[in-house]
Structure formats: C-alpha cells, structure tokens
C-alpha cells in the first residue's frame, strides 16, 4: 500500500503532480520542475522529505556501536549537535545505505536514513545494536522539511522564537540544535541539505508540520518537488542510494572515499574488504561527465573509455549549466577520450570533478572553454 506524508492533501491543494517514490505518494513538482530548481538556487524552496526515516540510538555503548557500524568515524564528533555523513556497509564492503548521524550526547545519537531502505536498515541496526545493548527507536512521530536556498536560513530564523535566533544564526554547517518556533513548535534544526545550497533540514512533530509548512509559504518560501531535488543533488555531486551505489558497490567505487575513515584500531564492518580494495587499486571508479552537445545523459547509457565500458548511473539536463550532466561508473585507470552511446551514436563528453555546481555557481572546468 502506498504511504502518504501528512502534507499529502496540502501538496494536492497546491496542484502538485504526485508520483510513487519508493512506496510513497510524493510530489514530483508543483507545475514546473525547472522553476522550482532555479528558485532553490536563487531564492528558497521547501521540500517535504517526511518519507525519510529518523532513528534514535541510545545506550552507554552507543559510541562503540557506531564505531563498529559506520565506515566514517563518529570519533570526529566532538561537539554536541555535530553531524557526520557516512556509509553503513555489509561485510562485503557494499553500501547498505548512506546516512547522516548526529551526536546529541555520549549515550544519544540520532540518525536519518533513506525511505526506500527503511525496513532493511532497521533490521540491520537492531541486529548489530543488540550485542552493545543499544536501543534502536524509529521516530514516526517526526516529520522532516528541507528548506534550501540562499534565503532559506534567514526565513527560518525569522520564524524562530527570539531566544533561539542568535544560536540558529551562528549554527555551523553539518551541525544541529533544538529550537522552537515563535508559536511554540519544537524544531530540531540541522544545517544540512541535499541541494548544494545553504539551508536547514528541520525535524518537527507530525501534528505541527502542516501549520509550519504554511508559515514557510506565507514567509515567501516556495514549494519544491522531488524532480527539482534530483537535479539539484546531481548538480551538487551528491549520490542517490539505489542508483549510484548499492550493496554490491563499495564507497571507493562510488566516489565516496572521503567518507571512509581507516583510523587505527577501529574494526568497522567491511573494513577488511575496503583495505584490500585500496591496496589492489579499485577495479571501478565513479566520474562526472558533461556533454557540450545538446541532449540529455540518462541512466543506463553505455560509456566508453580507454579502459573499457561503463555506464551512466544518474543523468539529467542541468538547469543551472544548460548542459547534460551525469555520474558514470567506468573501469579504473586512464580514461582517454570518453564517449556515450546515445541512440547508436558515440557522443563525446568531458570528464569533470564533482560537484558540477556549488551554491549556484558552476565549478572550475565544468563549463569547459565556452
């Protein structure tokens, strides 16, 4: 049965086109995906991401548990509220999910995981947590709104109670704090996102989400759907689980080496496989592609490099760059001239570093000589 967020009627009243996304009835756009993309890059937009899963982890051994569970190291989290992006791996080094974890106390961490992986994630977390005596509590009582764009933070801060505004203004990137709206709604506010823009992701009680959404819109934030969220995250060089990596792909094969912490004395799940991969040299690599010809790069298209064949993982037309962009997984090593098979024609593409766009600006080299 398709699940709905509490904002479902609100989305429909706003004229949203709804689609099934991982078993959830979600808005793909509210009229124009392109306009919503540009609004987030230039002003602000709000996404309903309440389909994602919030999990609270508690216990005296929660930190040792997470040191074992995650490829990135929670030892990096020294200050309450700080967040960490990490992959959770299986014993073969494949990615069970990518997630964000927040350090809220020595015996309390909060995790946000993907919607499509909810059941397997919860089963895996509970299995791995049991020997550590850590409780795994899903929080279906919390909704999530992502308010993103250059104006997003100022608007949200303007809706907070006076006593919290200074702390919210000073809140650093990849950090969170507990605050209240000026009408008393409890808000867990994180300076994180999935768009390449500044902004907040806000966890709040389900029974308050419609009212707070309406206040955001009244303050000038425009609704944005999953279509714009996808083009924004792709421009920002951010992976989508299930499309860019899965349980058969290691972080090293998904351009996520920066999320792997091979710190001494920490035996995390999958570490031995990653160390062997690193020593041998990865068999595959994930690269960024830009197509200067008119057209769109799409998932599944064949990619040819000097090292052999690969394929496009995520591909789209970039509204910011007005070019086709993509992630591709190809054989490791020298790439040479790279081409993509588009309807039987080998079309040349350029290899560029991620991200394609950061805070509204094309990154060096992405636009080429033009």
From Swiss-Prot:
- Keyword Transferase tagged: yes
Class of this enzyme: transferase
Reactions this protein catalyses:
N(6)-[(R)-S(8)-aminomethyldihydrolipoyl]-L-lysyl-[protein] + (6S)-5,6,7,8-tetrahydrofolate = N(6)-[(R)-dihydrolipoyl]-L-lysyl-[protein] + (6R)-5,10-methylene-5,6,7,8-tetrahydrofolate + NH4(+)
Instruction: Provide the alphabetized UniProt keywords.
Output: Aminotransferase, Transferase
Question: Which GO cellular component does the record give, naming just one?
Answer: cytosol
State its Enzyme Commission number(s). Answer: 2.1.2.10
TM segments? none
Superkingdom field: Bacteria
MF terms (GO), sorted A to Z: aminomethyltransferase activity; transaminase activity
Q: List the disulfide bonds.
A: none
GO biological process terms, semicolon-separated = glycine decarboxylation via glycine cleavage system
HAMAP family on file: GcvT
Function in brief: The glycine cleavage system catalyzes the degradation of glycine.
Q: How does it assemble?
A: The glycine cleavage system is composed of four proteins: P, T, L and H.
Q: Which family does it belong to?
A: Belongs to the GcvT family.
Q: What is the protein named?
A: Aminomethyltransferase
Q: Which organism is it from?
A: Stenotrophomonas maltophilia (strain R551-3)
Gene this chain is encoded by: gcvT
